[in-house]
């Protein structure tokens, strides 16, 4: 769970909405620091082989099916989600890699 603008956001709820799109093979949502909202969601998406999906289409789908504060602010398309030996998605790794790359710092 992360908190965006004082509201609890459960990644599983957002991920379930994303999996409604047939192009998505894997999806993970993480909360990252945001100066305005405290935290905001970033969607990491791995598409099924041969499929195409644009960020604007994914965001539009989320806007239609989620409360505004639950809609991811950014989408990152990746080949595959990082997993541990038992197959669990390593969201901590996604978060650390994202924050270390270009996410804004909170003062």
Task: Tell me what each language-model feature is.
Residues 96-107:
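Acidic/polar alpha-helix N-cap and adjacent early helical turns
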Residues 1-70, 79-82, 87, 93-96:
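AMP-binding/adenylate-forming catalytic core of the ANL superfamily
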